[in-house]
From Swiss-Prot:
Region ranges (Disordered): 69-88
Keyword terms of this UniProt record: Developmental protein, Differentiation, Glycoprotein, Hydroxylation, Secreted, Signal
CC per GO annotation: apoplast
Signal in keyword set: yes
Gene that this polypeptide is encoded by: CLE42
The protein, known as: CLAVATA3/ESR (CLE)-related protein 42
Record flagged with keyword rRNA-binding: no
Leader sequence segment: 1-24
Alphabetized InterPro entries for the sequence: CLE41/42/44
GO terms of biological process kind: axillary shoot meristem initiation; cell division; cell-cell signaling involved in cell fate commitment; phloem or xylem histogenesis; secondary shoot formation; xylem development
Amino acid sequence: MRSPHITISLVFLFFLFLIIQTHQRTIDQTHQIGSNVQHVSDMAVTSPEGKRRERFRVRRPMTTWLKGKMIGANEHGVPSGPNPISNR
């Protein structure tokens, strides 16, 4: 019969090995994915269609968007004064 210390040590080393292997695979996959993404983004930036689209893109300023939201909020007719029902 083996000593419990040896068994526990072997189990611990086995789990440590699994953790290291999993971590190493994750790092390898991350580097692989990162290099692929950079390659795709370089192609997208250098494409002539992308440059044309970016030139004519019009962005609305945030204040216009907020004004539109405020106008939409006033349309539903909520009175701004005191509640006449609660004053009876």
